């Protein structure tokens, strides 16, 4: 069960607790930016995640559909996450054994642009009961993965992976000139 052990990266990274309740992983989820495969807790720079990632969903039946949610629970900053969760991407009706490009994009991908601190970017995969209509939220900030799953009767997640991202040096901010 994901989130049941102290050494589980989803517990250590506080994904279980801040975003999700403990769950059982039953499907494979592969997320990659270029050649870089996302593994729990890895560090990716904002310049590496500007383009929509390649997402491959496991499963063994194309008649089973999945919903993918990507959120930042640390918006606008980890010390003051008053926009928690910030919705970066929402794709539904992804057939099993395929990828996000085969699903219905409800909210287009917005690349992470953290300004302060280390942000966790979380990909959560849910198995749907069947094809369904999902409406785009009115805004991206203060999204709740738990409430979304309840609203659309998605149950517990079937897979999750996350990475850490922080502002790159030299990417803006105060400059002092002699």
Swiss-Prot record:
Similarity field: Belongs to the phosphatidylethanolamine-binding protein family.
- List the source organism: Oryza sativa subsp. japonica (Rice)
Give a brief account of the tissues where this protein occurs. Expressed in leaf vascular tissues. Specifically expressed in the phloem including companion cells.
Identify the keywords attached in UniProt to this record, alphabetized. Cytoplasm, Developmental protein, Differentiation, Endoplasmic reticulum, Flowering, Nucleus
Q: Name the PANTHER family for this protein.
A: PHOSPHATIDYLETHANOLAMINE-BINDING PROTEIN, PROTEIN FLOWERING LOCUS T-RELATED
Complex formation:
Interacts with FTIP1.
GO CC terms, sorted: endoplasmic reticulum; nucleus
What is the superkingdom listed in this entry's lineage?
Eukaryota
Q: List the disulfide bonds.
A: none
Q: What are the BP-aspect GO terms?
A: cell differentiation; flower development; inflorescence development; photoperiodism, flowering; regulation of flower development; regulation of timing of transition from vegetative to reproductive phase; vegetative to reproductive phase transition of meristem
* Main function: Probable mobile flower-promoting signal (florigen) that moves from the leaf to the shoot apical meristem (SAM) and induces flowering. Promotes the transition from vegetative growth to flowering under long day (LD) conditions. Acts upstream of MADS14 and MADS15. May also participate in the promotion of flowering under short day (SD) conditions.
Q: What is the designated name of this protein?
A: Protein RICE FLOWERING LOCUS T 1
Give the induction annotation. Answer: Expressed with a circadian rhythm showing a peak at dawn and then decreasing to reach the lowest levels early in the night in SD conditions.
Q: Which Pfam families did the record assign?
A: PBP
InterPro entries xrefs: PEBP (IPR008914), PEBP-like_sf (IPR036610), PEBP_euk (IPR035810), Phosphatidylethanolamine-bd_CS (IPR001858)
Location comes to:
Cytoplasm; Nucleus; Endoplasmic reticulum
State the CDD domains in the record: PEBP_euk
Q: Which PROSITE patterns match?
A: PBP
């Amino acid at each position: 069960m994901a989130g049941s052990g102290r050494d589980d990266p989803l517990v250590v990274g506080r994904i279980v607790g801040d975003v999700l309740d403990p769950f059982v992983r039953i499907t494979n989820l592969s997320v990659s930016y270029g050649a870089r495969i996302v593994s729990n807790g890895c560090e990716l720079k904002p310049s590496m995640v500007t383009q929509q990632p390649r997402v491959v969903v496991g499963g063994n039946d194309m008649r089973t559909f999945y919903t993918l949610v990507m959120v930042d629970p640390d918006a606008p900053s980890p010390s003051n996450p008053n926009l928690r969760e910030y919705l970066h991407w929402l794709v539904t009706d992804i057939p099993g054994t395929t990828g996000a490009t085969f699903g219905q994009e409800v909210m287009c991908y917005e690349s992470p642009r953290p300004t302060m601190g280390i942000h966790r970017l979380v990909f959560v995969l849910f198995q749907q009961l069947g094809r369904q209509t999902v409406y785009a939220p009115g805004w991206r900030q203060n999204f709740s993965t738990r409430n979304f799953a309840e609203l659309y009767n998605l149950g517990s997640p079937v897979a999750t992976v996350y990475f850490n991202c922080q502002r790159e040096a030299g990417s803006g901010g105060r400059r002092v000139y002699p």
